[in-house]
Swiss-Prot record:
The keyword Secreted applies. It holds the Pfam family Sclerostin. This is Sclerostin. Negative regulator of bone growth that acts through inhibition of Wnt signaling and bone formation. It comes from Homo sapiens. GO terms for molecular function: BMP binding; carbohydrate binding; DNA-binding transcription factor binding; heparin binding; molecular function inhibitor activity. The gene is SOST. Residues 190-201 have a biased composition (Basic residues). Widely expressed at low levels with highest levels in bone, cartilage, kidney, liver, bone marrow and primary osteoblasts differentiated for 21 days. Detected in the subendothelial layer of the aortic intima (at protein level). Residues 1-23 form the signal peptide. Interacts with LRP4 (via the extracellular domain); the interaction facilitates the inhibition of Wnt signaling. Interacts with LRP5 (via the first two YWTD-EGF repeat domains); the interaction inhibits Wnt-mediated signaling. Interacts with LRP6. It is found in: Secreted, Extracellular space, Extracellular matrix. It is linked to Sclerosteosis 1: An autosomal recessive sclerosing bone dysplasia characterized by a generalized hyperostosis and sclerosis leading to a markedly thickened skull, with mandible, ribs, clavicles and all long bones also being affected. Due to narrowing of the foramina of the cranial nerves, facial nerve palsy, hearing loss and atrophy of the optic nerves can occur. Sclerosteosis is clinically and radiologically very similar to van Buchem disease, mainly differentiated by hand malformations and a large stature in sclerosteosis patients. Van Buchem disease: VBCH is an autosomal recessive sclerosing bone dysplasia characterized by endosteal hyperostosis of the mandible, skull, ribs, clavicles, and diaphyses of the long bones. Affected patients present a symmetrically increased thickness of bones, most frequently found as an enlarged jawbone, but also an enlargement of the skull, ribs, diaphysis of long bones, as well as tubular bones of hands and feet.
Length: 213
């Protein structure tokens, strides 16, 4: 008699506990591996996706690496270092009375804002980036006076000096001098014109006539 009475009391306590849970608004317990939070409900709504979410694991830019901010195809955005060089102009034994100053275009080309005298320097060069070289851009003419030894009268001479430099993009056809033939036989034929047959000389025609008889 005591065992059935104890079982009835246990069943009554369990039933009372379920009633209390349902009275507080909780959902029924489920025998699965999913935890149900009463405040969110059985099927919680996903949080809104942020527009500028860069942490998501998704392909961007079509699977290509992002555009490097310092790699540009516009040659005007590149600049090279201009070195000032002072020298005397000579013409045989004569030499200029005063030295002249011109620019020497040298160094590696890079973005103008990343030059050594600019603010915000950084590493911009990449192996896959385009190749540029520094070449003279504009020239200026200057007249100098040459002094000659031996009591000769001074003479004037006009020299051409570099005024500014620029960057030029290299192509895959540069530095391929071994593919070029600088001989006279490698002259390219002009397009649209047919080669003219060479006129026979009078001596060759006379020899043919003599052999005919």
């Amino acid at each position: 008699m005591q065992l059935p009475l104890a079982l009835c009391l246990v069943c009554l306590l369990v039933h009372t506990a379920f009633r209390v849970v349902e009275g507080q608004g909780w959902q029924a317990f489920k025998n699965d591996a999913t935890e149900i939070i009463p405040e969110l409900g059985e099927y919680p709504e996903p949080p809104p996706e942020l527009e500028n979410n860069k942490t998501m694991n998704r392909a961007e830019n079509g699977g290509r690496p992002p555009h490097h901010p310092f790699e540009t195809k516009d040659v005007s955005e590149y600049s090279c270092r201009e070195l000032h060089f002072t020298r005397y102009v000579t013409d045989g034994p004569c030499r200029s009375a005063k030295p002249v100053t011109e620019l020497v275009c040298s160094g590696q080309c890079g973005p103008a804002r990343l030059l050594p005298n600019a603010i915000g320097r950084g590493k911009w060069w990449r192996p896959s980036g385009p190749d540029f070289r520094c070449i003279p851009d504009r020239y200026r003419a200057q007249r100098v006076q040459l002094l000659c030894p031996g009591g000769e009268a001074p003479r004037a001479r006009k020299v051409r000096l570099v005024a500014s430099c620029k960057c030029k993009r290299l192509t895959r056809f540069h530095n391929q001098s071994e593919l070029k033939d600088f001989g006279t036989e490698a002259a390219r034929p002009q397009k649209g014109r047919k080669p003219r047959p060479r006129a026979r000389s009078a001596k060759a025609n006379q020899a043919e006539l003599e052999n005919a008889y």
